[in-house]
Amino acid sequence: MEIVSQVVGWINGFLWDYALLFLLCGTGIYFTIRLKFVQVRKFKEGFRRTFGGIRLKGEKADGSGMSSFQSLATAVAAQVGTGNLAGAATALIAGGPGAIFWMWVSAFFGMATIFGEATLAQKYRTQSNGEILGGPSFYIKKAFRGNAGKALAALFSVFTIVALGFTGNMVQSNSIGDAFHTAFGINPLIVGVVVAVAAGFVFVGGVKRIASVTEKIVPIMALIYILGSLVIVAVNYKNIPDAFRQIFVGAFAPQAIGGGVLGITVQKAMRFGVARGLFSNEAGMGSTPHAHALAKVKHPCEQGVVAMMGVFIDTFIILTLTALVVLTTGVMGSGKEGVSLPQAGFETVFGQFGVIFIAVCMLFFAFSTIVGWYFFGETNIKFLFGKKAVKIYALLVVGFIILGSALKVDLVWSLADLFNGLMVLPNLLALLVLSGVIAKALKSYEGGVQTRESLSGVAQRECNKEREAVCVGETTEEE
């Protein structure tokens, strides 16, 4: 096991210190420039569409898709998970406070990237036997014609199934088990079994039950955690300026706040900031497009605009509050790690109730992520093997949830980083190849062109020669 850990660590070092660090940020910067800072220009619209969707009762999810808000809720369910609590704490310990700054940077540019992901997922989604499916595998196949496209799409699907359904959900159950062991002294394995049974119940309900669960859990859990964190930060308001000083100084001159050698520590801050940021907001990873593909919208860019808000909520609100809780309460050097670190921060104000509060928040955060990631993995199972393999996949995921609750946390996180990174490579390559399609789609959207109309629940193609590149609608498997 030690050898496996070392090999995985070496590969992760190469991926996250060099390749993915520049590829993720570079792609985000490229789309930010090419789409003319779409994350800034369309922020107000995204805010309105997102929070307007909470107030309005949308369509019920079924085989023909979800409402725009249900799609976002399913995506945010995956985004807002252990990355916001345990992941933020891990980044702080491994990369110092400066890692939070690099999380912000990657998230800002990542908003442009995820706009492109959601737009392409909508454009290239398929309809088969009355069921809509979509995600990176479908647009990767379009980006690279012939066997190359099929091979890359298949690789992405394999990486996604392993990264989300297996190693990713092991991280979630591991964090739930850790939180409940700290709060109540319960054996993590017992917690894992209970979570697995509850998750299995949701899995068998299909997309309808998944959408129903996420649209109810996500707004409530996010609001409760935000309010609790704001109380902690408000109580320690005198430490807020120093917390931000540590974040900004730690990003460029960590020795000024007690860091190690400048070059190495800055590199670590960037590495763990980007890596944990990706694990948290998933921009560029290719996971959330599976949910955004199912949104019932008139134009693909409508969902692209909504998708950006998922990154904003995840990183700039929830993750930032977690970091401020840790930094303002002074528990950074307590020796705690993982979810135990924000638990220690809450304990300074709320006592044992704070420990229990984080355990409950972690349960809902991680459980919703398990549900969301299962759905993403299921989509890729169907892409590779069809519906016949879904039941086997569901049973395997349930087993890995139980297994993850009892494993050593370091190895679980390392495996998750590895397969998350492997997902990124084919996804970003396809995004770059199809960047012209994304830009033309945005141009038509801003020009007020409606490229999809719903007819009896089935979206029909409607395009002309001038806008053929941005024609959208479901395709059949035979196309």
Give residue ranges: language-model regions.
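Helix-loop-helix module between adjacent transmembrane segments
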Residues: 31-32, 106-130, 137, 141-174, ...
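Flexible loop linkers connecting adjacent transmembrane helices
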Residues: 37-66, 90-100, 112-147, 332-349, ...
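Alpha-helical membrane segments and immediately flanking helix-loop junctions
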Residues: 56-93, 120-123, 129-137, 141-143, ...
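Extracellular/periplasmic helix-exit of transmembrane alpha-helices
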Residues: 115-123, 129, 230-246, 254-261, ...
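Membrane-interface loop-to-helix entry segments
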Residues: 23-30, 34-47, 156, 173-180, ...
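N-terminal alpha-helical transmembrane segments of multi-pass membrane transport
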Residues: 1-78, 82, 93-98, 110, ...
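Selective recognition of specific alpha-helical transmembrane segments in multi-pass small-molecule
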Residues: 109-117, 193-207, 218-238, 271, ...
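Transmembrane helix-loop junctions in multi-pass membrane proteins
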Residues: 3-4, 34-39, 83-88, 164-176, ...
